[in-house]
Amino acid sequence: MRFIDKAKIHVKAGDGGNGCVAFRREKYVRMGGPSGGNGGKGGDVIIMADKSLKTLMDFRYKKHFKAENGQHGSGNNRHGRNGKDLIIKVPVGTVVKDAETGEILADLIYDGQKVVVAKGGRGGRGNAAFKTSTNQAPDYAEEGQPGEERWIELELKLIADIGIIGFPNAGKSTLISVLSKAKPKIADYPFTTLTPVLGVLQLDYGKSVVIADIPGLIEGASKGAGLGHEFLRHIERTKALIHMIDISDQRERDPIEAFEIINKELEKYSPELVKKPQIVVGNKIDMLSDRSLIEKLKKEFSKRGYPFVAVSLVTKEGLDQLIKLIAEVYEKISEKELIK
């Protein structure tokens, strides 16, 4: 599934209804008293998080949203009805910004959370509201105020339990297609995956783990190299990381060096990112001529405090061990969240 993680929309709140100029037509009431009602308030535009939504895809096709206007006042002191609020639903995890100023208006992190992004205009007062002891028959009323309008930027921080990181072509897309039903486009060149892909790994005991294939990082990503900032943004809300390394050709890049380069980019972007639990996965062992490398890497990463598993996504070797490790890490994360 292709994820669109940014959208720009225009919102316009409803205008307030106009106040009415009217007079009573009653017998024995000299000149008739003022009876113009007030206009109704315009509807607000509200953005609300909805857990059933997963993407910002709908905003590709519809970019303009307008709430209902307030109705005008009328005679016999009848006030206009308020305009209905317009509720725009977005996925949980959406950050709402003012597109012009960049100000964050809300970070919608739980289901049902709302933010008013454009307030409806106030209704105008009818002439009955202007009656005074010195002006018994005012012949004027107020117009309703226009509703607020502005451009809004929506940014979806992909919410997944575990993110798969690594250099382009480390095998991340293949892993997510093997672990889940997702079928990302896979080809043998860097930056094949240009948008994050979500996959779901079903565990034996009925639970499921949402895994995000984060597009390949490169050296300099924290400074915006390649599509660095776009990619790093997606990692922030994952609870743990699968760090994939291609160990088939050490002449091209040393596995330890590859691991350190990516981790340095994470740390430069946000020191919190490198504190996340990481499972290191050495991929493409079916292409290894010397398998002693697997034990060496296992010991090296163990010293650094990271679990290591070697796999071949072609032959499926090591996959069961990896799934078991993912389940263990997920359980630890879940236990910590329960304690919190």
From Swiss-Prot:
What HAMAP family does this protein map onto?
Answer: GTPase_Obg
Any keyword Nucleus? no
Q: Which domain of life is it from?
A: Bacteria
- InterPro entries per the record? G_OBG, GTP-bd, GTP-bd_Obg/CgtA, GTP1-OBG_CS, GTP1_OBG_dom, GTP1_OBG_dom_sf, OBG_GTPase, P-loop_NTPase
Pfam families the UniProt entry points to: GTP1_OBG, MMR_HSR1
Task: State the NCBIfam families in the record.
Answer: Obg_CgtA, PRK12296.1, PRK12297.1, PRK12299.1, small_GTP
Q: Which residues form the OBG-type G domain?
A: 160-331
Compartments where located: Cytoplasm
Upper classification of the source organism reads: Bacteria, Pseudomonadati, Aquificota, Aquificia, Aquificales
Q: Which of UniProt's keywords are assigned here?
A: Cytoplasm, GTP-binding, Hydrolase, Magnesium, Metal-binding, Nucleotide-binding
Biological process, per Gene Ontology: ribosome biogenesis
Q: Name one GO cellular component term.
A: cytoplasm
| Subunit structure, interactors included | Monomer.
User: Which segments constitute the Obg domain?
Assistant: 1-159
Family recorded in the similarity comment: Belongs to the TRAFAC class OBG-HflX-like GTPase superfamily. OBG GTPase family.
Residue sites binding GTP per the record: 166-173, 191-195, 213-216, 283-286, 312-314
> So which cofactors does this thing need?
Mg(2+)
* Enzyme Commission designation: 3.6.5.-
* Single annotated GO MF: GTPase activity
What residues does Mg(2+) bind to?
A: S173, T193
Q: What is this protein called?
A: GTPase Obg
